[in-house]
Design a protein with these regions (language model features):
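Bacterial signal peptide processing site
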Residues: 18-21
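C-terminal motif of bacterial Sec signal peptides marking the signal peptidase cleavage site
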Residues: 13-16
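Short, acidic Ser/Thr/Gly-rich low-complexity loop/linker segments typical of extracellular
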Residues: 51-77, 101
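Structural motif
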Residues: 30-54, 79, 145
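Metalloprotease/metallohydrolase-associated module, dominated by Zn2+-dependent proteases
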Residues: 27, 236-238, 242-259, 275-339
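A short, solvent-exposed beta-strand micro-motif common in secreted/extracellular proteins
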Residues: 81-93
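Disordered inhibitory propeptide/activation segment of secreted metzincin zinc metalloprotease zymogens
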Residues: 23-31, 92-98, 102-168, 180, ...
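Metzincin-family zinc-dependent endopeptidase catalytic domain
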Residues: 166-271, 275
Length: 339
């Protein structure tokens, strides 16, 4: 399945300058008046992790000098407030970053995206239209009994008289575990846990489960839909992903096709809340023939340095949004159609 490409713009930074009259020589800036309230900030490059100097902060009642060579700066406010205020961090060569920060407050790290990074592809992958992601490593539940496919929207499934071999199960778990760090910016090194279930023949299993990623083989998925895999994810309105389900066609998964690992990684991406990429090569291309690459690793690294709800260009949600759980819904889902 595909989705509509967002109409996107580009961002650039600009530097201002001033000049003195011809009768006066160079002037040395005097010491700035310290703000009554302040917060320490360290600015880093979201991809390399290196510090960024020359970053300026702006916002309502906000003051402060540009970040040092060590990437440090102090952001001051004209008053103290228990609520966070929007502060924009700007530097040429980087996308302007807007965060919600408390002044005064504890030291924060602000990561900035280089302007050379493909924001259009990033938006396709992760922000549709706002960032969706898990906030803690999900557990994985493997159903070893093959289930009967009836619909991409089915909430439960009947089990048939067929069980995944131990070798197939271990291979599936290994591929998903291999893909997880690469699809989470190395934030999640492993699933929170892996459990295996084998329900009785003709028993029924709930396939939409909160707090876990459920994966199973389905008989008849490709025949009915043309897809080798299909996945859905559950998310709150603030962008936090809290559940996922992965359907893999039984016949495809038992085959020795070269795309099997890339398909598994692709479907895991959907269960993590990601959508199809059309602009450049990615594990989340609808063809699902590409394993996680540099773009995927960098994009998810950036994403996991931002809270759910972050929007283009690079603006974090207000504190009120971060603290609101909101309702949870299941996505319509996306699939990998056979070629």
């Amino acid at each position: 399945m595909t989705r509509q490409l967002l109409c996107l713009g580009l961002v650039c930074g600009a530097l201002g300058c001033s000049s003195s009259s011809s009768n006066s020589g160079p002037t040395t800036p005097g010491p700035s008046t310290p703000a009554a309230f302040s917060t320490s900030v360290r600015v880093t490059d979201a991809i390399t992790g290196s510090t960024v100097s020359g970053v300026t902060a702006s916002g309502d009642g906000v003051s402060g000098r540009a970040s040092s060579l060590a990437g440090t700066m102090t952001v001051g406010g004209d008053s103290s407030s228990a609520s966070a205020r929007a502060v924009a961090f700007t530097r040429a060569g980087y996308v302007t970053r807007t965060v919600a920060m408390k002044i005064p407050g504890n030291e924060i790290v602000v990561s900035m995206i280089p302007s050379t990074f493909n924001l259009d592809a990033y938006d396709e992958l992760l922000r549709a239209p706002r960032l969706q992601r898990w906030t803690s490593a999900p557990p994985l539940r493997v159903q070893t009994r093959t289930l009967q496919f009836t619909s991409i929207n089915q909430s439960d499934a009947a089990a048939i008289d067929e069980v995944m071999s131990d070798a197939d199960r271990l291979g599936l778990e290994a591929d998903l575990s291999w893909a997880l760090p690469q699809l989470t910016g190395n934030t999640f090194q492993a699933f929170a846990g892996i459990t295996r279930d084998t329900i009785d023949v003709n028993g029924r299993m709930q396939v939409l489960n909160t707090g876990v990623i459920t994966v199973a083989r389905y008989a008849g998925l490709t025949t009915a839909t043309g897809y080798w895999g299909y996945s859905r994810w559950q998310f709150r309105t603030d962008g936090t992903v809290i559940g996922g389900t992965i359907m893999i066609d039984r016949d495809f998964d038992r085959s020795s096709r070269s795309e099997r690992r890339s398909l598994r990684a692709h479907e895991l991406g959907h269960a993590l809340g990601y959508t199809h990429v059309t602009i450049l090569t990615s594990v989340m291309n609808a063809s699902a023939v590409t394993e996680p690459n540099t773009f995927d690793r960098q994009a998810t690294q950036i994403a996991f340095l931002r809270p759910p709800g972050n929007v283009r260009l690079d603006s974090d949600p207000a504190e009120a949004s971060l603290n609101r759980l909101g309702a949870a819904v299941w996505s319509r889902g996306e699939g990998f159609r056979r070629r």
